[in-house]
Each structure stands twice: as structure tokens, then as C-alpha cells.
């Protein structure tokens, strides 16, 4: 991902304020509520029968935290996202058979959640930088599918 120094600073400055536990669970939960067909990848997570059940599900929260942990790692390796996400790409492609379009959806949901949490601080410039990052991460996660 090519970010200007200003974009990189904006991304890292905001990310330093992110509560990964909270935002991760909220982002994954929103993905499962807004795009219910994505729930098929989470059969083992128990009750996903309603928005309240999804958002309160401890397995959704735990996996969301794990997802954002990997995203955080990616932020430390923006120049090598494909390498950083190679194993996760292979896992999601070969073993889990996740539609790579879902990575884009999750990235966009993450941007919405960040906007919700940070309000005015999440300026259009910050959003533009995050859109580049989530697109780069989605592309890296889809790499093994090509």
C-alpha cells in the first residue's frame, strides 16, 4: 500500500487510540449482521439468530479481537502486506474457503466502526487513508486465491 507520510501518520495516530477488543468485536459483529450470508463461516460460534445475539456473542467478540490483532500487525508492515498476510490468505483460501469479497466487506465495516467511534476526528482525509489500508489488506488476504 502506498501511503503518503501524512496518511501514514494519520493511520498510526488514530490506531494508537483504538480499543482493539471493542472495535474488533463490533466490526466482525456488524459484518455478520449487515451481511448475514457471512455467518455461514461461523457455524461453531453458537447463537447468531438476531443482531443482539451476534453483537453479544463472546466468540464473535474474541474472533473480532483476533482479526484486529492481525490488522494491527499489517499496519506495522504496510510495505509487505502480502508477506504479512500470506499464511492467513492460505488458511482462508485453502481450508476455510472464504469468499475473498468478504475481506473487502469487513474492511469497509471497520471503516464505519472507526468513524462511529472517532466522530469528527475521523476526517475525510483519515478515512481516505484507512480506505487505502483496508483495500490493501483485503488484496493481500485474497492473494492466494489468484
UniProtKB/Swiss-Prot annotation:
The modification Phosphoserine is found at residue 44. Keywords: Acetylation, Heme, Iron, Metal-binding, Oxygen transport, Phosphoprotein, S-nitrosylation, Transport. Residues 2-146 form the Globin domain. Heme b binds at residues 63, 92. GO terms for biological process: hydrogen peroxide catabolic process. The modification N6-acetyllysine is found at residues 59, 82, 144. It comes from the Eukaryota. The modification Phosphothreonine is found at residue 12. The keyword Heme applies. The modification N-acetylvaline is found at residue 1. The modification S-nitrosocysteine is found at residue 93. Pfam families: Globin (PF00042). GO terms for molecular function: haptoglobin binding; heme binding; hemoglobin alpha binding; metal ion binding; organic acid binding; oxygen binding; oxygen carrier activity; peroxidase activity. Red blood cells. Involved in oxygen transport from the lung to the various peripheral tissues. This is Hemoglobin subunit beta. It comes from Papio cynocephalus (Yellow baboon). The lineage of its organism: Eukaryota, Metazoa, Chordata, Craniata, Vertebrata.
